[in-house]
Regions:
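Strongly charged, low-complexity linkers/loops
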Residues: 174-189, 194
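Glycine/charged-rich beta-loop-alpha catalytic/anionic-binding loops adjacent to active sites
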Residues: 14-16, 73-78, 191-194, 213-221
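Structured adenosyl-cofactor binding patch, chiefly the S-adenosyl-L-methionine
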Residues: 205-253
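Short Gly/Pro-enriched loop/turn and capping motifs at secondary-structure junctions
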Residues: 176-180, 200-204, 225-226
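N-terminal positively charged helical leader segments and presequences
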Residues: 1-68
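RNA substrate-binding interface of SAM-dependent RNA methyltransferases
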Residues: 70-171
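A C-terminal functional module that forms or caps the active site or interfaces directly
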Residues: 190-210
């Protein structure tokens, strides 16, 4: 845990025995005067300084909040990925949220198993995927959470997001029918980016036609047939490098 998430910016202490207090005291072994990163979900990040540790283990702190830091913003890259097995989806969400993207949109693909959409992952109130996003925020020290949604089909996604698609640089990754290497595709810095990756069994011809009809370029990530979660990690990394989004991590001071 590199960042402690707060319920709101007014929090100034952690009661003894809470997960945050346990991590700070047992893992980081903090003392009065030590600092740690904290943040509010989709809000500010700040540097907390420990001001008191009570005999019972309650930790009090003050926070110097960052002002409009670019480090805590999500990149202008949206991920569209075909619905896969629940275990694979967990890996996709972990990779995408750690590397960084603005949204994770999932669609039921023509080659995918319809039963995957009945997984508890997609039930209202299930905390598995939100929990993965929370762990990624704590790991990356970035309190910004990507939004996510499940669409009933690729066609449904394309219809509902036509305006956004027209404003974005859209690339579909496909190992079997690419036009060129993703490395050779330019991404205009002033545009949002939309990356589309098929499900575990890939794209159908109808899905390819739908994407091409909406202005998607097709690209490959090399000759290796990658797992979906690996393709997600590679594609996002290449895209973020192309738009020069990366900035150095700030050290505690």
């Amino acid at each position: 845990m590199n960042l402690v998430l707060l319920d709101n910016p007014k929090v100034v202490d952690f009661d003894a025995g809470t997960p945050a207090a346990e991590h700070l005291s047992r893992v980081l072994k903090i003392a009065v005067g030590d600092t740690f990163w904290c943040g509010v979900k989709n809000g500010a990040r700040g540097l907390a300084t420990v001001t008191d540790i009570s005999p019972s283990g309650k930790i009090s702190f003050s926070v110097a909040w960052e002002k409009d830091s670019p480090d805590v913003k999500l990149p202008p890259v949206r991920l569209l990925v075909g619905l896969s097995r629940p275990q694979t989806m967990k890996k996709i969400f972990a990779a995408a949220s750690e590397i960084g993207c603005a949204r994770i949109d999932v669609f039921r693909s023509e080659k995918g198993d319809p039963a995957y959409a009945e997984s508890s992952l997609w039930k209202v109130g299930d905390e598995t995927l939100p929990g993965i996003l929370k762990k990624s925020a704590e790991q990356t020290c970035i309190p910004a959470f990507p939004e996510f949604r499940l669409y009933r089909s690729l066609e449904h996604f394309l219809e509902e997001n036509s305006d956004e698609i027209q404003k974005s640089a859209c690339v579909a990754l496909d190992v079997y029918a690419p036009e060129k290497s993703f490395g050779n595709i330019a991404l205009p810095p002033q545009k949002n980016v939309l990356l589309a990756i098929g499900s575990e069994r890939g794209w159908t011809d109808a899905e390819r036609a739908g994407l091409r009809g909406n202005g998607f370029a097709f690209a490959h990530l090399g000759g290796r047939v990658l797992r979906v979660e690996t393709a997600v990690a590679v594609a996002l990394s290449v895209a973020l490098s192309k738009i020069d989004f990366w900035t150095p991590h700030k050290r505690l001071s």
